[in-house]
Swiss-Prot record:
Keywords: Isomerase
SUPFAM superfamilies named among the record's database cross-references: D-ribose-5-phosphate isomerase (RpiA), lid domain, NagB/RpiA/CoA transferase-like
Organism: Methanosarcina acetivorans (strain ATCC 35395 / DSM 2834 / JCM 12185 / C2A)
Top enzyme category: isomerase
Pfam families: Rib_5-P_isom_A
Quaternary assembly: Homodimer.
Active site: E112 (proton acceptor)
GO biological process, one term: D-ribose metabolic process
GO CC field: cytosol
Protein name per UniProt: Ribose-5-phosphate isomerase A
EC numbers on record: 5.3.1.6
Pathway: Carbohydrate degradation; pentose phosphate pathway; D-ribose 5-phosphate from D-ribulose 5-phosphate (non-oxidative stage): step 1/1
């Protein structure tokens, strides 16, 4: 089987992705995230399915991860059939010292969040470049096209600077797997991610935003293959 080449090889991402795959055992229901680091997790799980007889069911967060999982030989299910998962594994665009994350660079954050909160344990895989003391990157906000301008107005009232995400290989805006637009919002340093998350969620027309405050553990990969594991403090 020829697997899709998902990204330029990265020792750090590979180390983190493969280490997280080691958390999975037969009988598990596993949420499979989207992005270059979790692609290594999906490939490793596929190897274990083929070579070790690993028996799992995966729930994917995007068409990209669905294609990777199918190519890897992972059997898939849905949240409609299995609304509670044992584990979800995903990447992040940025994650702070208290394991609050920004996700959504791939415009899949709505499904990623639904899958992550459906899991008993949510593990983020990343390299050191994604870690930061505080969150300060652009926050993706998925919005209904009908509500774009009212949402832009409300976000500006919160101090944000929203920009409609444009597609790279076609004219017009990025359209999510759910058929919506994405606003990339600059807030500067986000001093209280939990509060901002609640404010964004309360805006009518916002489908979901990219602030994740439910990460259980962070697996950070290094070039030498070593892994640093950080667990959320209770």
């Amino acid at each position: 089987m020829t697997e899709r080449n998902t990204s330029t090889d990265s020792p750090e991402k590979r180390a983190a992705g493969i280490a997280a795959a080691g958390l999975v055992s037969s009988g598990m229901l596993v949420g499979l995230g989207t992005g270059s680091t979790v692609a290594y997790t999906i490939k490793e799980l596929g190897r274990r399915v083929r070579e070790e007889g690993l028996d799992i069911l995966g729930v994917v967060t995007s068409y990209q991860s669905e294609m990777l999982a199918i190519e890897a030989g992972i059997r898939l299910t849905t949240l409609a059939q299995h609304p509670e998962l044992d584990l979800a594994i995903d990447g992040a665009d940025q994650i702070d010292s208290e394991l609050r994350a920004i996700k959504g660079g791939g415009a899949a954050h709505t499904r990623e969040k639904i899958v992550s909160v459906s899991a008993r344990r949510f593990v983020v895989v990343a390299d050191e470049s994604k870690t930061s003391k505080q969150l300060d990157k652009l926050v993706p906000v998925e919005v209904l096209p009908f509500a774009k301008e009212p949402v832009v107005k409300k976000i500006r009232e919160l101090g944000g600077k929203p920009q409609l995400r444009s597609a790279v290989k076609k004219d017009g805006p990025v359209i999510t797997d759910n058929g919506n637009f994405v606003l990339d919002v600059e807030f500067g340093v986000i001093k209280d991610p939990e509060a901002l998350a609640l404010q964004l969620s309360s805006i009518p027309g916002v489908v979901e935003h990219g602030i994740f405050c439910n990460v259980s553990e962070l697996y950070i990969g290094n070039k030498d293959g070593a892994i640093k594991i950080i667990t959320r403090q209770k």
